[in-house]
Amino acid sequence: MIVWYYIGFKESLKKFSPEVRNKFYKQVSFLLRDLRHPSLRAKKYEEARGIWQARVDRNIRFYFLIEGNTYILLDIRTHPK
C-alpha cells in the first residue's frame, strides 16, 4: 500500500502541534502495515460512503479513501464530542 495526500491535507496537518504531527505519522506507519491495527480504531465513516476514519489520539481523527493499493488521506481534524 502507498499513501497519497489530497490537496490541502498537509496544510490541515500543519495546524496541529509537532507532537500531534509525530503521532499522526506513527499512525500512518501502522495503517501501511495493518488497517486493523488496534490503535487506529479504523472504521468506515458513517456519514460518507467509502470514506474511512482512524484515530491519531483521543481527540483527533484522520479521514481517508482506499483505492486499489493506495490510501488517499483526505482530512485531519479534531473529533467532535
Model-inferred region functions:
Residues 30-54:
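A short, surface-exposed loop/turn module that caps and links secondary-structure elements
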Residues 2-7, 11, 18, 22, ...:
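Enriched for short, Lys/Arg-rich terminal
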Residues 8-39:
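N-terminal first-folded block
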Residues 1-2, 49:
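Intrinsically disordered regions, especially transient/low-confidence alpha-helical propensity segments
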